[in-house]
């Protein structure tokens, strides 16, 4: 139904799982929705555990890092684990990019050129884990001056990232710019 499509479009398929009965769905639609919500929850924990492991290594190596989108957005949800996430988006200051790239490779993550759909990030894959996008920059502004300004603001904020609890996982979230 339209409700399910909208929940998926907004990356919150699991959000109303505890209130599904009140949506007056058919038993078949209810069962399908609950199955999708359960799958989302399982994927969420798998991603967060992989991210947690990588972030611990970045911390130990002294590499300033922040999570973009995904868990950083989920930190603002009443039920963070209801947010759908497909990959892990990380950003480091430009002078730490090569160090971060090498660290991911040492941890067994393979640089995957096919994941590099644009020059914004390097893509990494590892068996049984979600993909990682290590961002070189974030802005997609076509105005170069605006893009540079936004990216500089993000780079300057990374060392001040606030390690925030997201459903039991510690996530470096950019402070207000």
Please report, for each region that a protein language model flagged, where it lies by residue:
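Conserved NTP-donor binding/palm subdomain of two-metal-ion nucleotidyltransferases/polymerases, i.e.
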Residues: 1-86, 92-177
């Amino acid at each position: 139904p339209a409700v399910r499509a909208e929940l998926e479009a907004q990356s919150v398929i699991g959000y109303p799982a505890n209130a599904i009965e009140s949506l007056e769905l058919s038993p078949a639609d209810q069962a399908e929705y609950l199955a999708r919500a359960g799958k989302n929850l399982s994927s969420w924990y798998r991603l967060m555990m992989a991210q947690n492991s990588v972030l611990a290594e970045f911390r130990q190596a002294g590499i300033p890092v922040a999570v973009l989108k995904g868990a950083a957005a989920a930190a603002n949800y009443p039920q963070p684990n209801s947010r759908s996430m497909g990959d892990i988006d990380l950003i480091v200051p430009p002078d730490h990019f090569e160090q971060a790239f090498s660290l991911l490779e040492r941890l067994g993550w393979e640089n995957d050129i096919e994941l590099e759909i644009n020059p914004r990030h390097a893509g990494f894959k590892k068996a049984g884990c979600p993909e990682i996008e290590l961002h070189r920059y974030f802005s997609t502004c076509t105005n170069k001056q605006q893009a540079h300004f936004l990216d500089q603001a993000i780079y300057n904020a990374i060392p001040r990232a606030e390690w925030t609890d997201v459903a039991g996982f510690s996530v470096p979230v950019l402070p207000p710019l």
